C-alpha cells in the first residue's frame, strides 16, 4: 500500500482494516514522510519511491496506491508487471495522462501549481501549503486544520513540486513509451465524486489505455477518499480482489 503525499503509512490503516480478511498488507512511508529519511534530491522522487516499493516485493502482489502513491504503483506495474497480480489506483495524480488527451489542461494546471511553486521559491511555505491543500486537501479550511497538520504540510510542501517532471511531464516515459498501453495487469481505478476535475480526466485517460480497467466512483468523497471513505473504497475493492483468485 502506497500512501499519498503529506501523509504517512498509517493513513492507509482504515482501508487495510476493510481488507484484512482478504490480504496481508504492507505499507511504507514515502521519502520525507513518516519515519523515512528526508528526500535529498539525488534521485528523482518517484524513482526513489518505486525502488523503495520494489524492495518489499518478492512475487506477484496486489498493489494499492493513492494519489502520488498511485503514480508510483502505476510506474512499478509498467516496469515490473511480473511482480503485480492486480493494480488498484485511487486518484492517481498522473497528470501527464490527462494532458495527453486534453492539452489545454497543461496550461491551466501549470498556472495553479505555478502559484504554489512561486510561494515555495519565495520562502513562503505557508502560502504554498494553503494553496495546495485548498484544491487537494481534505476539504477543511487552512485555519481550521490542527496546528501540527499545518506545520507538517509546510515542511513537506516542496515534495509536491519535486515530482512535477515525473507526474506532469512524463519524464520517465511511462506514457510516451507505450508502457501504459501495453499493461495487462488487472486494474481498478477509483475516484471521489467531488474530487478536482483533473482526477476524472486522469482516470478516464488511464482506463482508456489499460486493457480491461474497471472504474469506480465513490459518492460524497473528494481526493482524500482512501482515508475519508475507507470502508466504501474497501467495499468496491473486495469483488475486484476476489476475482483475482
List the predicted regions and their residue ranges.
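The conserved beta1-alpha1 loop
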Residues: 2-4, 66, 191
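Gly/Ala-rich beta-loop-alpha elbow adjacent to hydrolase catalytic centers
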Residues: 65, 69, 73
Amino acid at each position: 500500500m502506497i500512501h499519498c503525499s503529506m501523509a504517512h503509512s498509517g493513513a492507509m490503516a482504515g482501508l487495510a482494516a476493510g481488507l484484512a480478511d482478504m490480504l496481508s498488507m504492507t505499507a511504507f512511508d514515502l521519502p520525507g514522510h513518516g519515519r523515512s529519511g528526508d528526500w535529498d534530491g539525488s534521485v528523482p522522487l518517484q524513482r526513489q519511491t518505486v525502488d523503495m516499493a520494489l524492495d518489499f516485493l518478492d512475487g506477484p502482489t496486489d498493489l494499492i496506491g493513492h494519489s502520488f502513491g498511485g503514480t508510483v504503483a502505476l510506474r512499478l506495474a509498467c516496469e515490473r508487471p511480473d511482480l503485480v497480480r492486480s493494480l488498484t489506483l485511487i486518484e492517481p495524480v498522473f497528470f501527464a495522462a490527462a494532458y495527453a488527451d486534453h492539452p489545454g489542461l497543461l496550461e491551466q494546471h501549470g498556472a495553479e501549481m505555478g502559484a504554489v511553486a512561486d510561494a515555495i521559491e519565495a520562502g513562503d511555505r505557508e502560502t504554498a501549503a494553503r494553496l495546495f491543500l485548498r484544491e487537494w486537501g481534505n476539504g477543511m479550511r487552512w485555519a481550521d486544520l490542527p496546528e501540527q497538520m499545518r506545520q507538517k504540510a509546510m515542511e513537506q510542501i516542496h515534495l509536491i513540486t519535486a515530482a512535477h517532471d515525473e507526474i506532469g511531464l512524463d519524464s520517465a516515459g511511462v506514457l510516451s513509451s507505450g508502457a501504459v498501453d501495453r499493461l495487462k495487469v488487472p486494474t481498478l481505478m477509483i475516484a471521489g465524486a467531488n474530487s478536482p476535475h483533473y482526477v476524472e480526466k486522469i482516470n478516464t485517460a488511464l482506463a482508456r489505455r489499460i486493457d480491461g480497467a474497471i472504474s469506480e466512483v465513490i459518492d460524497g468523497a473528494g481526493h482524500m477518499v482512501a482515508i475519508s471513505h475507507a470502508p466504501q473504497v474497501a467495499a468496491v475493492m473486495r469483488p475486484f480482489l476476489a476475482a483475482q483468485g
